[in-house]
Amino acid sequence: MEDDIQAVVIDNGSGMCKAGFAGDDAPRAVFPSIVGMPKHLGIMVGMNQKDAYIGDEAQAKRGVLTLRYPIEHGIVTNWDDMEKIWSHTFYNELRVAPEEHPVLLTEAPLNPKANRERMTQIMFETFNVPAMYVNIQAVLSLYASGRTTGCVLDSGDGVSHTVPIYEGYALPHAIVRLDLAGRDLTDYMMKILTERGYSFTTTAEREIVRDIKEKLTYVAMNFDEEMEKAARSSTLDKSYELPDGNVIVIGNERFRTPEVLFKPSMIGRECTGVHECAFQTIMKCDVDIRRDLYNNVVLSGGSTMFPGIGDRMTKEMTKLAPTAMKVKIITPPERKYSVWIGGSILASLATFQHMWISKTDYDESGPSIVHRKCF
């Protein structure tokens, strides 16, 4: 490993791909993890039409494309599309030759083993990287917050999970994974906006709803009181201008949408809310370390960006925790990118340099090396 060659850090989320160089304090490229296929045949001669559009370009042309997300619930479901996204990341976004840089990738905890192996295989065989490493997202978020102990609630677009980390070690037996995240909230918002008479159905319209969700929603401190308040007056109403110039008004949808994180039964899911997941995670840990975990609940990921979520988490977890226990929720302002930032910190540490899986390691042992070298 040369010292002057920067490692590439790629955080492949279900919704957004964050990529950049180790040592930087923010990702250079952030683009949607979308592959768009044209719905119609191109007829204009001389237009350089492609067979696939990726990321922002797919987003811009979404009206004539069918959009696909290759990562669902944190797991890659379409490897051909995933290769397109990676190659777009290296060649178009970062403009680097992958064979010259070690690559750090991230993944959701409790992912299928085959998923990791396939990632490793593609990196070494398709992109010929000199070295690579796969790390669990939540652990990286904790690095970014400057802690070595804490319970991380990481909620992105496709998957949420709570991971307890003590003195830098993730405790795998206590990880709770929740397949409920930003995309489910967007779907739910599409549904409840339909009740208002606004119809959003296509993959392109879903992106509009995602934008409404990101700009206007918030978490209510007390859901029932907020519902009554919304019913009594229109003080909570906000308007949003659609791309065609029409203006729609949204009211209680603003806080009904993120409420799903705390009450998954609202969308017919039997799973527990995020506050209970964090509580279950802490309860699965040794009794001696629980206080440290309660005092360091770190939020990370885009679906923890809702205003009011920190206070609401504090309230809900204090209810569940033992009476004298102080619950402290940490909401770093850069938490949307904290997984990437943690990866950037890790890959630039001198002590990390002997951890990489090298091309030689891979040639000797094959894809299964990833389970031995990457914890």
Curated annotation (Swiss-Prot):
Key words of the record: ATP-binding, Cytoplasm, Cytoskeleton, Hydrolase, Nucleotide-binding
Function: Actins are highly conserved proteins that are involved in various types of cell motility and are ubiquitously expressed in all eukaryotic cells.
Subcellular location: Cytoplasm, Cytoskeleton
An annotated Gene Ontology molecular function: hydrolase activity
Regions that span the bilayer: none
Predominant location category: cytoplasm
Similarity annotation: Belongs to the actin family.
Full protein name: Actin
GO cellular component: cytoplasm; cytoskeleton
Enzyme Commission identifier(s): 3.6.4.-
Keyword match Nucleotide-binding: yes
Keyword Hydrolase appears in the UniProt entry: yes
Pfam families named among the record's database cross-references: Actin
Domain of life, source organism: Eukaryota
Catalytic activity entry: ATP + H2O = ADP + phosphate + H(+)
SMART domains noted in UniProt: ACTIN (SM00268)
Gene3D superfamilies for the chain: 3.30.420.40, Actin, Chain A, domain 4
Cysteines joined through disulfide linkages: none
Record-linked PANTHER family: ACTIN
